[in-house]
Amino acid sequence: MAEAVPASPASGLGLHRGIIQWLVDNFCICEGFSVPRCLMYEIYVETCGQSAQNQVNPATFGKLVRLVFPDLGTRRLGTRGSARYHYDGIYIKKSSFFYAHYCYLLGKKSCHSGNLIAFGKFPDYSNVLQQEETCENHSPIKKDPMGSPVSPFRRCPVWEQELANKYSCKLVVFLADEYCNYCRDILQNVRNQELEKVEDLITSFWKSRQQDTVMLMSLPDVRQLLGCYDMQLYKGLEDMLLPDFLEDVSIQYLKSVRLFSKRFKLWLLGALEGFPAILQISKLKEVTGFVKRLRRKTYLSNMAKTMKMVLKNSRRIGLLKSDLRAIIREGTLDISKKVLEGDSDHEEEPESHTEMKCLGCLISLLETSTDLAELLNCVSSNLQVLVFQPSKNKEDFIKLAASFQLKWNFLLTAVSKAMTLSHRDSFGAWHLFHLLLLEYVIHILESCIEEEEEEDLGSLQDLLSDDQFLTQPDQALFHPLDSLPTSECASRNVESPQVTLKHTSQSCGPMGMGSVVLQVLGFLVDTATGNKLVQVLLEDKTTESAVKLSLPVGQEALITLSNGQRFVIHISDVPQSSENTYCRKSNANVQGGLLE
């Protein structure tokens, strides 16, 4: 191969741009396929680098390949002595002018080496074509014989109403309707195995957004609402694509699932080109999490599928059990007490540590069961006792999870080391089991953190939609927010009313007025009558009783708390410039019977 010759920066930059464009025009991401590095460079030299002055060396060419495909993997394929490095996850486009030549060279090299160099199984041109068609056309959705409909997509009407109250009502309502329909359509098309329509749905939705809608979607609280809907979308896709990684599915199916998730991400990022950076970052974070979770589950599924085959082999599992018992019994594990003890002040024997107990439970279970689900449930039970139950909050959980994972990894690695040094025949089976146990613990811990984040978002929804009070006043004195079907949120320039609170109790004793708090929650307009409504919360901290009301402006309401205290709330309009105008969600203490 020719080495690159010195060139001026300008000519070098132009040369690199040409190579990058050549890579983009002729190669694409294709999960499950690989391209030999030497063959890719050979085609480049034959087609683009015929002049020595216009060639780059293989190292520079490899850097440019990774610049175009940053997530590209590398695999060494072939038998011992004739293995070659491959770029894993890309393939030459069928529309490429060099496609036929590439297939010819691929078959030629395969025949000469006596190996199947590429990930494809066939050296001839027609079979390579057939395999690529299989990859592209294989649907990653299993047919549902029951034909069950897509899970209901949960709307957040009160949350939407809060945002509409803060911004333009019509624009928020329109955006929420459009976005939810967009998510539902994606789920329905995936359920119907119409994956080719998903790209069009994504592109058409984002490219049809007007500038005012885009700016609204970029606001922090609106992004949070849309993130809630994205969470439901991705959760629904995961449940349809791969609900359980222990389910028996084909390797080709797993490849198709990974390919679809990666394509989904590319479709979304492509549709978001030109949008505000903050919106792109938000959507990138959400879709990256979706791709990461599916990749983790497909990886686990692949390992579980292989491990099940090992567990069905009585000879292999017998060797594994005897070798593990021998290693534990002979004390050949190279384990440092300091590593297992961590922050513990008392010394214990290595066998008495929690991680050793967890491993001991697995070894004992192998004596009676070869069901992979039972083995993994054993790990889950130990995690529940050692990590989940002792955690008082999220910080404690993260600390305990990190500590367990570190010690668990160290322990399993020590077993692998002992297996290697003692030349155990079951090393291959243990190595697979080792990887599966590591990934499964990571899956459980990361899934818990993700679910907790989802629960936090769900709690926010519940908080915004909660119209229940500790003490219910007379129904004639108030109108609950959810009981106003004709109400819509007022625009932001609605005048804030003045709220006055008067104490009317006949008791002669001290009344503890400082413990009563009146909070203005929001403003509404009844479109049917044109009346202004104010949502307020009256709370007595001493008795922990509260009343949540939606009151019309210009009227009084008589409120009785559970301790017998009675109050009159009067709401009146004031000019916008008045110093007594109260902002939304402001707290105020009652002093002298009036709201200051």
UniProtKB/Swiss-Prot annotation:
GO molecular function annotations of the record: DNA binding; DNA-binding transcription factor activity
Database matches in InterPro entries: DNA-bd_RFX, RFX-like, WH-like_DNA-bd_sf, WH_DNA-bd_sf
Pfam family for this entry, one: BCD_RFX
GO cellular component, one term: nucleus
Species assigned in the record: Mus musculus (Mouse)
Protein name according to UniProt: DNA-binding protein RFX8
Location(s) in or outside the cell: Nucleus
Family: Belongs to the RFX family.
Primary site of residence: nucleus
Record flagged with keyword Transcription: yes
Function, in words: May be a transcription factor.
Keyword Mitochondrion tagged: no
Keywords: DNA-binding, Nucleus, Transcription, Transcription regulation
